[in-house]
């Protein structure tokens, strides 16, 4: 249900007002808290940060911690993540933990799971992390601007037991809406929002254009690729003297298989590769189709060459009962017209699910879920893309299993939280509705989401 700010302040203890100077020298700090009585393990501060995306020019970004994308958070599977989030931005915000199966009150959706964290306030996020893998965190408020300015960061959940990988790297892929002088360009343009989404112009890895990542020669290295972009789908491939295998998709392990053709990595999606690094001095191009994103450079390493690790252990996700599952249809549609926004900042309605366009300015939208699921019951969602543009469909709070598609041969079904639904594609995904609450279900092309392609699904 939706609620007022007064109701939320009476019902939650996580939201607290602090002075804008809170944190002192730790203004951009993300780090381990040593005080056992602090009630949290990490402090994470969102604040303005000057970055140099274009050489010789300064861009006024927003960041979680001292870098954009934000500093990597790490936690071990099955343990608690306790983060005190402090807002030093000029606008309100939240943190959504993308892909994590957690309680509703920790999900970071304004007026659904919590109130927005206003400037000068902090909020304590606390939840147990059930699944290992590559995840990320970002706001769910003013998303085009806040994610576009740099408020994104990786969350890595380490397996309970060692995996056999001795070396690993996290590569955060993001394009930036900046011009040749590093100045901001529009994060969302209606003409582009009605198509593939408003793309950025500068491609970076870990916040750097033309990035070079050094990797140990002769080793099999775990490389986590995270698409933290607002709109862009990367066609991931490698060019060079190397062999690569896919070990996990969107945090969830798969049977290791070669990376062959382009892997289409949509916004919000992640892929875990194992790459056998060649001899020292050799280079591998990480590419988006034919476009080089960055360089992987082999450097001298004293260790003996490593072998391919075994498959990663599966996450503890409930298997859906396909024989007795209830089937539901969800159609991603063009709204049929370009409506005019209002003076209150309401974006146009361009997209809809099952004939309903989400209004991000309406705080009561979640009171009208597009579907209500019974807790513990299995469901098969028929996802139909009735448009000419692809949509990475993301579900909060639960994982689903991809079991069929009219465009892809699903040889090995896999669990995920985000599925890239191609143009005119019809796909089937299955899940157990095991997490009570009202959960967002939306396209992760951000200006598709903000112009209607979002809904609420309730589990009761």
Regions inferred by a protein language model and the residue ranges of each:
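Extended terminal and domain-junction accessory segments
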Residues: 11, 19-43, 147-179, 255-390, ...
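N-terminal edge beta-strand
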Residues: 56-74, 201-211, 349-375
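Extracytoplasmic beta-sandwich strand-turn segments characteristic of Greek-key/jelly-roll folds
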Residues: 68, 73-75, 99-131, 246-279, ...
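N-terminal secretory signal peptides and thylakoid transit peptides that target proteins
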Residues: 1-16
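Hydrophobic or amphipathic alpha-helical targeting/insertion segments
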Residues: 129-158
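Asparagine-centered strand-capping/turn motif at beta-strand->loop junctions
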Residues: 85-89, 226-227, 383-387
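Histidine- and aromatic-rich segments of cupredoxin/plastocyanin-like copper-binding domains
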Residues: 106-107, 115-118, 186-324, 407-410
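Active/binding-pocket-proximal capping segment
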Residues: 240-251, 386-414, 446-450, 458-460
